[in-house]
């Protein structure tokens, strides 16, 4: 059991963290029929394409600053109840623009919820602005420019998410240069739906501190060694990987092999209710299904804090809290 362990997370898409119960309440608020995406209080999808469609439908249920404050506070409060001391949420200002709320109001709403959760529970959290890969390089550059300009104290990083099989990583290098120059931490989705080559391309063209997922690096031994040698941190999401059939089961998941090869790995939930998981469940999976000991899991949590996109005083406070 891992309930007694402190936890930290670097990879969760905030709209993807919406509990079905909250989605249903939002649907009633706006008079939206959710029968195609929620059945028996669970999200319904079959493959990555239908997952994205379901995700977008859920995201459309949040339309005001107050809605987003509620979402962030709800998620982070539940994390804190499970012993989580730190969380990074992946956010998409593009969605705020699409729904007519605006990027600034979207960020401010989330920030209000994050602060409310911190006051209530003590949990620290930060936002990573994400570009959407399948919207193309020009869209991602605009998002990067916004992230570089919008210096909210809780916005500390930049990510690239979306359909990994569309566009080459090199097409997004300018966007990452923009946010790197602005001092934001860099991570990028790679090595999930695409193979080891996508991780290598990310290292070559983006030079991130972290890779979102990255698990298919296991297909290339030289790449695994490179990750270990360069100290690049992988944000690993086992429950998501099995749900999306990146790997058929936890026995075949490479987290243990990556860990033993010296790669810096962390535990994350990705889009937890969509994949019938939670951060607490990911810790349980590591313990029961993958054979990690308490001390090994603690090491992964420490890695997450060491790799977090936070200022050094906050990092020191979190490291001190890890074993309190």
Swiss-Prot record:
Record site feature (Important for catalytic activity), residues: 213
A biological process from GO: nucleotide metabolic process
Cofactor(s) recorded in Swiss-Prot or TrEMBL: Zn(2+)
Binding, Zn(2+): 11, 13, 189, 270
Active site residues per record: 192
The protein's Enzyme Commission number: 3.5.4.2
Annotated catalysed reactions: adenine + H2O + H(+) = hypoxanthine + NH4(+)
Keyword annotations: Hydrolase, Metal-binding, Nucleotide metabolism, Zinc
Keyword Metal-binding: yes
Stretches that traverse the bilayer: none
SUPFAM superfamilies the UniProt entry points to: Metallo-dependent hydrolases (SSF51556)
Cofactor: binding comment: Binds 1 zinc ion per subunit.
Keyword Ribonucleoprotein on entry: no
Binding locations of substrate: 271
GO molecular function: adenine deaminase activity; zinc ion binding
Family: Belongs to the metallo-dependent hydrolases superfamily. Adenosine and AMP deaminases family. Adenine deaminase type 2 subfamily.
HAMAP family: Adenine_deaminase
Function, as annotated: Catalyzes the hydrolytic deamination of adenine to hypoxanthine. Plays an important role in the purine salvage pathway and in nitrogen catabolism.
Protein name: Adenine deaminase
Lineage: Bacteria, Pseudomonadati, Pseudomonadota, Alphaproteobacteria, Hyphomicrobiales
């Amino acid at each position: 059991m891992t309930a007694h362990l402190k936890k930290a997370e670097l990879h969760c898409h905030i709209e993807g963290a919406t509990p079905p119960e909250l989605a249903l309440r939002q649907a009633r608020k706006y008079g939206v029929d959710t029968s195609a995406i929620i059945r028996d209080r669970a999200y319904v999808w079959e493959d990555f394409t239908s997952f994205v469609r379901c995700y977008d439908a859920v995201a459309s249920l949040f339309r005001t600053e107050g809605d987003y404050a509620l979402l962030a506070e709800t998620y982070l409060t539940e994390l804190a109840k499970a012993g989580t001391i730190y969380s990074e949420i992946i956010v998409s200002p593009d969605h705020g623009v699409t729904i007519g709320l605006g990027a600034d109001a979207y960020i401010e709403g989330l920030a209000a919820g994050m602060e409310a959760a911190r006051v209530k529970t003590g949990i620290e959290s930060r936002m990573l602005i994400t570009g959407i890969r399948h919207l193309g390089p020009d869209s991602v550059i605009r998002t990067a420019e916004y992230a570089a300009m919008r210096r909210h104290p809780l916005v500390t990083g930049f990510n690239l998410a979306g359909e990994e099989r569309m566009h080459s990583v090199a097409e997004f290098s300018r966007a990452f240069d923009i946010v790197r120059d602005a001092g934001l931490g860099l991570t990028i989705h790679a090595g999930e739906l695409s193979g080891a080559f996508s991780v290598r391309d990310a290292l070559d063209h983006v030079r991130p501190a972290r890779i979102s997922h990255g698990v298919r690096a296991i297909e290339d031994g030289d790449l695994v060694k490179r990750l270990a040698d360069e100290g690049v941190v992988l944000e690993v999401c086992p429950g998501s990987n099995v749900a999306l059939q990146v790997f058929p089961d936890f026995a075949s998941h490479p987290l243990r092999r990556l860990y033993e090869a010296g790669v810096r790995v962390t535990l994350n939930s990705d889009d937890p209710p969509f994949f019938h998981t939670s951060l607490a469940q990911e810790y349980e999976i590591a313990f029961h299904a993958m054979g990690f000991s308490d001390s090994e899991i603690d090491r992964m949590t420490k890695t997450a804090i060491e790799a977090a996109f936070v200022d050094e005083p906050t990092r020191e406070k979190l490291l001190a809290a890890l074993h309190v």
